[in-house]
């Protein structure tokens, strides 16, 4: 039987690790300086544990893990455009780091971009858990199957819903 409370906790830790890998100078999930390799190893272990919990029949965990990690540079590139869109689109933004640390929309979008890649790999449950977690934090509800291009910015996003077919 799956302990869903523990699964959610693991998912939150995974997101923290992935954000630390994507933006090591902004986020630090391990609360002290660690190398990119150490962060990646911890995130890979965390993702493997989650996949082992949610799959009834063991798939190729390594394929899912390797594919997600191979997509991280592209996710980072797209998130950089999202940060740029917020910075340029909101006159109140004083710097890019402020967008990453203080804007709820960036949190929702960054979690969505990770969840979307897992959704495309047909990973069950985890992508939706991620975006619902973002929804609970930010008030922004983005379905993991939604198609969202680069330079995406939501200003004052409470109550925004983006469905898979929007």
Task: Give, region by region, the residue ranges found by the protein language model.
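Terminal amphipathic alpha-helical/low-complexity segments used for targeting or macromolecular assembly
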Residues: 1-132
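Structural signal for interior beta-strand "rungs" in well-ordered beta-sheet cores
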Residues: 134-166
């Amino acid at each position: 039987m799956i302990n869903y409370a523990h699964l959610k906790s693991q998912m939150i830790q995974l997101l923290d690790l992935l954000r630390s890998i994507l933006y090591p100078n902004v986020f630090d999930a391990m609360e002290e300086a660690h190398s990119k390799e150490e962060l990646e190893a911890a995130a890979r272990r965390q993702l493997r544990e989650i996949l082992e919990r949610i799959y009834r029949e063991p798939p190729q965990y390594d394929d899912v893990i390797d594919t997600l990690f191979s997509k991280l540079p592209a996710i980072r590139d797209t998130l950089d455009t999202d940060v740029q869109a917020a910075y340029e689109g909101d006159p109140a933004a004083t710097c890019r780091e402020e967008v990453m640390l203080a804007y709820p929309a960036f949190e929702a979008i960054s979690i969505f971009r990770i969840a979307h890649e897992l959704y495309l790999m047909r990973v069950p449950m985890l992508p939706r858990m991620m975006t619902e977690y973002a929804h609970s934090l930010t008030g922004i509800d983005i379905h993991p199957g939604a198609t969202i291009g680069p330079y995406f910015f939501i200003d004052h996003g409470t109550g925004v819903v983006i469905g898979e077919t929007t």
